């Protein structure tokens, strides 16, 4: 695959995920351009990486030379034209199908003919996203987990017409950036979220039925060795985010087993979104420490 030698990767979106993915690619030796139309997002992304690497240098887990070398491979741009020359484009824009499609359309028009475009969606249809391009065979899903530089998993998701060659290139790229891959089906939630989020939803039903959040969390932490209970995880991720995923499963499968817990909907409507708002299933202080329960 002649394009693999180009060594250039473009990451679209400089938010939490895009920033982490760009960092992972640059650390692995790729030349990365992180593209975002918002200057504020780029400035924040730059500052985040700079701060993180400076902390590593201070702790002694990274040398100044290594830091300079990695940052030297990481450039930022507000211009989509800069996808030119990249063998791979990773899209990490907000999880809304219209934004994804607009982004893919734009990248498809500007990228080299043989460039592969992958989406970091956590559950939207790859085939639908690919349909707006002239290269649906060169489109697939590559779902990273937060924080992207640290989490070892990459869910690979083929669309209906993704080619074997595209899959092979993306799998090889995943290995080079130190990720272990799983082949996830092109259905809502892919693999991790389809198993994880219904567990969080079931835990919310238990709280709705009168169980204490601490009891539900302790049951799973001590009984199943989970590092974090399902209720605290929901607060941590954001109740709105978790509910959106659950609703996506429900609408995608049209199956009542994915019925979102009504308590979650009430909480979201009331503005209790979890740790980020200071109020969720638990109450939090300004520093984000748990100071009690709301149930």
Segments from the language model and where they lie:
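Rossmann-fold dinucleotide-binding core
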Residues: 116-185, 190-194
